[in-house]
Amino acid sequence: MKGLLVIVSVLSSFLTSLEQKTLKADFVATVAETADAPMNYPGSITMKGKQFRLSMGSIEAAFDGQTMYMYSAETDELNLTLPTDRELIESNPFLFALEMAQQCEVTERASSDGKQTIITLVPREETLGINRFVLKVQNGTLLPLQVEVREGTKTSTLTLMGPSFITTEPKYMLEPEETTFVNDLRF
């Protein structure tokens, strides 16, 4: 059609990539309250769409689209739950962008060096306690580099290292060892 201009936002393209491709990255999660020193937690994440698998120290979590698996190596315990939206977003902040983008005011701007796009989502209404969500995406590849989530006085930042889209499809569930205590709370 002549004269038709279609503008595709970076956020829309990024969300499509998350739905269609498998993202894998190491990260450092930093959590800070206004008066406290920040705490850092290293980990790794693999995700596609709503499904994800992440590891942080002695904790592993996975979501297969229905069941949340939370494993603690310290207690050798695996909890199975049907998570709420809030529990999913607390486990994987990318899900906020996937689930809530339509309910937010969205702005996009180039970083000072022009190599990234900074996407800010501000909920129009109180949404799961989140006041602001900022995502930094590498231009061209649409790989996420950083996510910042503000909830009241708490700021959580997820800085990704070596993000890539992979072709190997991982299992988005955790299988217990024979000695693992399984606590099935899916009722």
Predicted segments, located by residue:
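An acidic-aromatic
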Residues: 44-91, 151-156
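Short beta-strand segments that buttress and anchor functional surface loops
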Residues: 27-29, 53-57, 118-125, 145-150
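N-terminal leader/targeting segments and the immediate start of mature chains
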Residues: 1-39, 46-51, 176-187
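Non-transmembrane domains of secretory- and envelope-associated proteins
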Residues: 113, 124-131, 139-187
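Short beta-strand micro-motifs enriched in acidic
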Residues: 46-48, 109-111, 136-140
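Short, surface-exposed coil-to-beta transition loops
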Residues: 38-41, 55-57, 64-65, 128-133, ...
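Residue-level detector of beta-strand structural context in well-folded domains
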Residues: 43, 52, 59, 104-108, ...
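Flexible, processing/modification-adjacent segments and terminal tails
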Residues: 7-26, 38, 67, 71-131, ...
